[in-house]
């Protein structure tokens, strides 16, 4: 049965602004995470083997990858603090990325078993980072875990470093998990084990955060994450975190996968949470193909944020998928060329033409939807489909602008784009 009142009510179609979950603002160098600040994009460097006999040269190679990620748009870059060699390399890494115009505080040190020892042995090096990450599940075990956790938190307090308390279901505190599992099994109406696992993740993160506060770390120095591999688990865990606390939240799957699977899993989980106002910083943990740059994980995060209107990074190109009416590859070739043109020119445009990242461009392949779709964009072009005249209509801000034809359609359309940018974004 149709609800005509609902269908006819204009409010049904009103696009409301995403209401962000209220969280504490955490400052990581010059980057602000949480509150009403833009959702921050971060990544993790794959890293290189640090040669103990040639620390400076190794650091230069490490910094090259970090710089590539930062230049793509990663606002924070995580590095693994997994050896003395890495700790010794930090000043040289910072020096190299400073040369490229990036602040050393974009670096986040991710420590595991070795973190307690490294902050004691290399305090002046690690304080050069913007943030450190602690995994409560493997910083230590038994009483030693509490001692090591306390020492790292005290170090962070001393050097005014924010901390991400990052729980991972692959390295969850086994004592807490076993305790909750035992309690559950003793109940007459026991719950499925996956429910208890999610509960343990949230409890581990929040208990550790409260413990850090008890030691003296302010809540505006704490970021929380609970990493899992399944989208539905991610959603349930972060909804529970948002209901239970106001800590800034770092979103991401612990391992999303390779190729389309990794991108889809990341987009599915993060988009749902972000659309519901949950999440202050994000990462796409993608498995890159051999030889593929890790910058793709930065681009995926940017695309997710732009797709739901939370942030804008580049002009949006909407393009036709093709069908039986598209008789050639011209629309595909033009789409690729337009994307390449934007990628080449966007660094200059962003400096000279503020707001250009909000621009929309449509490249369509035939007359059926071409003109209509083009009119919804700032600039649109409708290429000829099967049986149509070999001409391409260009639309500007919803109105017919001109017709292009011949062998120079691509160059002429790119010139139109460039002129539009200069005219409308100053």
Swiss-Prot record:
Name any one GO molecular function. Answer: iron ion binding
Residues the record lists as binding [4Fe-4S] cluster: 320, 323, 366, 373
- Name the chemical reaction catalysed here: (2E)-4-hydroxy-3-methylbut-2-enyl diphosphate + oxidized [flavodoxin] + H2O + 2 H(+) = 2-C-methyl-D-erythritol 2,4-cyclic diphosphate + reduced [flavodoxin]
Q: Give the matching Pfam families.
A: GcpE
Q: What is its EC number?
A: 1.17.7.3
The Gene Ontology biological process annotation of the record reads: isopentenyl diphosphate biosynthetic process, methylerythritol 4-phosphate pathway; terpenoid biosynthetic process
Instruction: List the cofactors.
Output: [4Fe-4S] cluster
| InterPro entries hit by this protein | Dihydropteroate_synth-like_sf, IspG_bac, IspG_bac-typ, NO2/SO3_Rdtase_4Fe4S_sf
Q: In which pathway does it act?
A: Isoprenoid biosynthesis; isopentenyl diphosphate biosynthesis via DXP pathway; isopentenyl diphosphate from 1-deoxy-D-xylulose 5-phosphate: step 5/6
- Which free-text remark accompanies the cofactor? Binds 1 [4Fe-4S] cluster.
Which Gene3D superfamilies does UniProt cross-reference here? Dihydropteroate synthase-like, Sulfite Reductase Hemoprotein, domain 1
| Superkingdom field | Bacteria
Q: Does the keyword Iron apply?
A: yes
Q: State whether keyword Iron-sulfur applies.
A: yes
Q: Coiled-coil region(s) at which residues?
A: none
What's in the keyword line of the UniProt record? 4Fe-4S, Iron, Iron-sulfur, Isoprene biosynthesis, Metal-binding, Oxidoreductase
Give the family, as the similarity comment puts it: Belongs to the IspG family.
Query: Cross-referenced NCBIfam families, in alphabetical order?
Result: ispG_gcpE, PRK00366.1
HAMAP family, alphabetically? Answer: IspG
Reported function: Converts 2C-methyl-D-erythritol 2,4-cyclodiphosphate (ME-2,4cPP) into 1-hydroxy-2-methyl-2-(E)-butenyl 4-diphosphate.
The protein, known as: 4-hydroxy-3-methylbut-2-en-1-yl diphosphate synthase (flavodoxin)
What high-level taxonomic lineage is stated for the organism? Answer: Bacteria, Pseudomonadati, Pseudomonadota, Alphaproteobacteria, Rickettsiales
């Amino acid at each position: 049965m149709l609800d005509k009142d609902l269908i006819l009510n204009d409010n049904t179609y009103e696009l409301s602004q995403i209401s962000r979950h209220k969280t504490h603002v955490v400052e990581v160098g010059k980057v602000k995470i949480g509150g009403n600040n833009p959702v921050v994009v971060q990544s993790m460097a794959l890293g290189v083997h640090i040669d103990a006999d040639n620390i400076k040269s190794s650091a230069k190679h490490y910094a090259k990858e970090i710089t590539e990620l930062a230049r793509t748009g990663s606002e924070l870059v995580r590095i693994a603090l997994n050896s003395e060699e890495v700790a010794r390399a930090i000043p040289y890494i910072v020096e190299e990325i400073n040369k490229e115009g990036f602040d050393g505080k974009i670096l986040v040190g991710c420590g595991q078993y070795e973190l307690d020892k490294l902050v004691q042995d290399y305090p002046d090096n690690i304080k050069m980072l913007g943030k450190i990450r602690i995994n409560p599940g493997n910083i230590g075990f038994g009483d030693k875990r509490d001692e090591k956790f306390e020492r790292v938190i005290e170090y962070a307090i001393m050097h005014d470093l924010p901390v991400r308390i990052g729980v991972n279901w692959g390295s969850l505190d086994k004592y807490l998990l076993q305790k909750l599992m035992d309690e559950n099994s003793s109940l007459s109406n026991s719950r499925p084990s996956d429910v208890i696992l999610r509960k343990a993740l949230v409890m581990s993160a929040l208990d550790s955060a409260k413990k850090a506060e008890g030691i003296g770390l302010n809540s505006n120095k704490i970021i929380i994450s609970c990493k899992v591999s399944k989208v539905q688990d991610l959603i349930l865990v972060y909804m529970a975190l948002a209901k239970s606390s106001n800590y800034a939240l770092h979103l991401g799957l612990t391992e999303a996968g390779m190729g389309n699977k990794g991108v889809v899993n990341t987009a599915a989980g993060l988009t749902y949470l972000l659309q519901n106002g949950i999440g202050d910083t994000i990462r796409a943990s993608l498995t890159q193909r051999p030889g593929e740059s890790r910058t793709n994980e930065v681009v995926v995060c940017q695309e997710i944020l732009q797709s739901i209107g939370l942030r804008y990074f580049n002009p949006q190109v909407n393009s036709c998928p093709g069908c039986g009416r598209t008789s050639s590859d011209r629309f595909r070739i033009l789409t690729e060329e337009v994307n390449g043109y934007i990628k080449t020119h966007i660094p200059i445009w962003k400096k000279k033409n503020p707001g250009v990242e909000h621009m929309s461009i449509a490249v369509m392949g035939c007359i059926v939807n071409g003109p209509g779709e083009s009119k919804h964009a700032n600039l649109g072009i409708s290429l000829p489909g099967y049986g149509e005249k070999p001409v391409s209509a260009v639309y500007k801000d919803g109105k017919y602008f001109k017709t292009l034809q011949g062998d120079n359609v691509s160059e002429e359309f790119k010139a139109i784009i460039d002129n539009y940018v200069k005219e409308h974004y100053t």
